[in-house]
Swiss-Prot record:
Glycans are attached at N67, N305, N345, N423, N464. This is Probable exo-1,4-beta-xylosidase xlnD. Its main location: secreted. Keywords: Carbohydrate metabolism, Glycoprotein, Glycosidase, Hydrolase, Polysaccharide degradation, Secreted, Signal, Xylan degradation. It catalyses: Hydrolysis of (1->4)-beta-D-xylans, to remove successive D-xylose residues from the non-reducing termini. Transmembrane segments: none annotated. Its EC number is 3.2.1.37. PANTHER family: BETA-D-XYLOSIDASE 5-RELATED (PTHR42721:SF3), SUGAR HYDROLASE-RELATED (PTHR42721). GO terms for cellular component: extracellular region.
Length: 771
């Protein structure tokens, strides 16, 4: 920790700016049994959360308050308040970050590494998501209790994956707002151990609020990008996951993003942070706080040029509702801003009370023996059950994109394993990762499966050299079957780095093409979060099978070979659209519009119909027959639907109906089946009409050959409604069609009619007239 003297006009503030991680340790939990802190009401467990937090803040000097508005808060030694680092990460397992400290060996040197969210999204399994989050929070709490992490984690990333070029799409569960909304609801439920619990296990942080999905594209960078978004698109596409997270799942923290939204930097935007988030969604309970992304407060001044001075940037963010700075603008300049009268002490106190209320709820100031989570420790990290769950999650997410009955592989024999992922380890984790105890490589898994393996890398992810081709082709000629493992990795897509193309990088397709001409069965295993154009592989009859595996993490190799060998049948579905390569020439990444226009083709499966592979696509090793029950659907009346909604439930979350379909396994292989229910209309509400909209889904487990399974899909009123130009959520009368997309060209439909008058389910707050 460096001690820095900073003079701001009349006030001299001693800033404690941390230059390295500040981690908790068991002996630096606050001592409420003796010492100066014990004399404050913050240690009185009989009092309410806000009163306890306010007593601590009131005991601080102005200087101490300002010092503790940064992510690596130095605490207040005078009061016995220890340092605390608010920045811990756990996107798909406890991850390396300033607040997390892994040991070099032994206890706390690793944690369970689950698949990246993009692959978790492909499972379409809400129960699984909650189970994964429960394990992650348990392990995160263990690290926190041991002084190796904070008790809050800056996860999940719930910006819908709008454009395949975005470098951080791998961190999200996909492109569909309903899907992402359900994902985050169950994830937060698992992380915090309940919906709005009084005593959360850990605090989750939904990010990045809002309309953030650009890193560095053709010279446009996230630190200065102004996302121009219509009110309709904002309400319909960009905000629903955050509404689910804040209003419905009652997350304890939200992160505002780097970008500006319609001219106002997100962390300086009271319309976003106050009007929509805290007021309209009623996200205003004790312990609910907002952090800026790391450097986002500085961007208000340096990137967006929104204010003339950094002091103005600090005050503007604080006044807008940002409580914590992941940076140093708050601690360096709030003193100057106070001198200039740019904010009130009441506003500063409010931010700090929010932050410390969160720690009070976490039991940070309570006796260890009174806290249910303080006993969690190393014994609870990477348990056999956690490892099994990591394996299950990877298997469930894998998507079969092509198969001419080559899969499952029928014999052991000799297997040529070729490609840059053939023996990959850390590559399979994606980003925001932590060290796992082990990583099962494809090479390891192939050997364990009993194959005589001939392993040759052949090429690298983005290589142009063909020096390794001959060895790869030689190995393939000696094998009974060839498995090529490639795609993209974090050298191609990453935070701070968007793609400019969506083709296979380097010379990988050239090598695959040459392998396909040898005459041996060829299976391609495609890694990566963002999709690449697979047209040439799908059309090549000598590429016999194609799998997409995302970033499967520590169990990647074994999970993939479970699918390849038929130990488990594939049932994952693409959580995004796979666009043709030329799509990037039709619309810039900076264009935030979803609907097609005179110069744009439209985005996502709802508005674009020329996909190489559509959202929700996924093949199986068996066949399924889908049928609707023998009953009429509807008609429904808008007034009746609205009037029967429970008073204590937001009307858009109220039930519309539960639809029953019958799924019959007509093949010979036991398999899961993901039922995706889409809605279409051609006359309900104003044009243009989306091609279709996902309104519900469920994953039916282990349907045996010949078995008929009744599957229920619940649909909410909000899913039936459409978003008007002003952002209102409106239930329109008209004719509707339900479509079950089974991914294999079977689209059973059912129709119904909604009668009555238009009904507004949610009146969206209108932006200020100046925007």
């Amino acid at each position: 920790m460096a001690r820095i003297m900073s003079w701001h006009y009349g006030k001299a503030i001693t800033l404690f700016v941390c230059l390295g991680p500040v981690a908790l340790s068991l002996d630096t939990f606050p001592d409420c049994s003796s010492g100066p802190l014990s004399k404050l009401a913050v240690c009185d467990t009989s009092l309410d959360v806000t009163t306890r937090a306010r007593s601590l803040v009131n005991a601080m000097t102005f200087e101490e308050k300002v010092n503790n508005t940064q992510y690596n808060s130095p605490g207040v030694p005078r009061l016995g308040l220890p340092a605390y680092n608010w920045w811990s990460e756990a996107l798909h397992g406890v991850a390396g970050s300033p607040g997390v400290e892994f040991a070099d060996s032994g206890p706390f040197s690793y944690a369970t590494s689950f698949p990246q969210p993009i692959l978790l999204g492909a499972t379409f399994d809400d129960d699984l998501i909650k189970q994964v989050a429960t394990v992650v929070s348990t392990e995160g709490r263990a690290f926190g209790n041991a002084g190796r992490a904070g008790l809050d984690f800056w996860t999940p990333n719930i910006n819908p994956f709008r454009d395949a070029r975005w470098g951080r799409g791998q961190e999200t569960p996909g492109e569909d707002p309903l899907h992402v909304s359900r994902y985050v609801y169950h994830l937060v439920d698992g992380l915090q151990n309940g919906i709005g619990p009084a005593n959360p296990k850990v605090v989750a942080t939904c990010k990045h609020f809002a309309a953030y999905d650009l890193e560095d594209w053709n010279g446009v960078v996230r630190h200065s990008f102004n996302a121009e978004v219509s009110t309709q698109d904002l309400s319909e596409f960009y905000l629903p996951p955050f509404k689910s997270c804040a209003r419905d799942a009652k997350v304890d923290a939200v992160m505002c993003s780097y970008n500006a939204l319609n001219g106002v930097p997100a962390c300086a935007d009271s319309y976003l942070l106050q009007t929509i988030l805290r007021e309209h969604w009623k996200w205003d309970e004790p312990g609910h706080w907002i952090t800026g992304d790391c450097g986002a407060i500085d961007d208000i001044y340096n990137g967006h040029n929104y204010t003339k001075t950094p002091a103005e940037a600090a005050a503007t963010a604080l006044n807008a509702g940002t409580d914590l700075d992941c940076g140093t603008v708050f601690p360096k300049y709030l003193g100057q801003a106070a001198d200039e009268g740019l904010y009130t002490n009441k506003t500063l106190d409010k931010a700090l009370v929010r932050l410390y209320s969160s720690l009070v709820k976490l039991g940070y100031f309570d006796p260890a023996e009174d806290q249910p989570y303080r006993s969690i420790g190393w014994k609870d990290v990477d348990s056999p059950a956690a490892e099994a769950l990591a394996h299950k999650a990877a298997v469930e997410g894998i998507v079969l994109l092509k198969n001419d009955k080559t899969l499952p592989l029928k014999a052991k024999g000799t297997l040529a394993l070729i490609g840059p992922y053939a023996n990959a380890t850390k590559q399979m984790q994606g980003n925001y990762e932590g060290p796992p105890k082990y990583i099962r490589t494809l090479l390891w898994a192939a050997t364990q499966a009993g194959y005589d393996v001939k392993y040759v890398a052949g090429t690298a992810i983005n290589a142009n050299s063909t020096a390794g081709f001959d060895a790869a082709l030689s190995a393939a000629k000696q094998a009974d079957v060839v498995v090529y493992a490639g795609g993209i990795d974090n050298t191609i897509e990453a935070e701070g780095h968007d793609r400019t193309t969506i083709v296979w990088p380097g010379n990988q397709l050239d090598l695959i093409d040459q392998l396909s001409k040898i005459g041996k069965p060829l299976v391609v295993v495609q890694f990566g979060g963002g999709q690449v154009d697979d047209s040439s592989l799908l059309s090549n009859p000598h590429v016999n099978a194609l799998l997409w595996t995302g970033y499967p993490s520590q169990e990647g190799g074994s999970a993939i070979f479970d699918i390849l060998t038929g130990k488990t049948a594939p049932a994952g579905r693409l959580p995004v659209t796979q666009y043709p390569a030329d799509y990037v020439n039709q619309v810039p990444l900076t264009d935030m519009a979803l609907r097609p226009g005179s110069n744009t083709p439209g985005r996502t499966y709802r508005w674009y119909d020329k996909a190489v592979l559509p959202f929700g696509f996924g093949l199986h090793y068996t066949t399924f027959k889908i049928s609707w029950p023998r009953r009429a659907l509807g008609p429904y009346d808008t007034a009746a639907l609205v009037s029967r909604s429970p008073k204590n439930v937001p009307i858009d979350r109220a039930a519309f109906d539960t639809f029953h379909i019958q799924v019959t396994n007509t093949g010979k292989t036991t398999s899961d089946y993901v039922a995706l229910l889409f809605l279409k209309t051609i006359d309900a509400g104003p044009k243009p009409y989306p091609l279709k909209t996902l309104v519900g889904y469920t994953r039916a487990k282990q349907i045996k050959p010949g078995e008929k399974r009744s599957v229920d899909i619940k649909v909410s009123l909000g899913s039936l409604a459409r978003t008007a130009e002003n952002g209102d959520l409106v239930l329109y009368p008209g004719r509707y069609t339900l479509e079950v997309d089974v991914g294999e060209n079977q689209y059973p439909t059912a129709s119904f009619t909604v009668k009555g008058k238009e009904a507004i389910l949610d009146s969206f707050p209108q932006p200020p007239e100046t925007r």
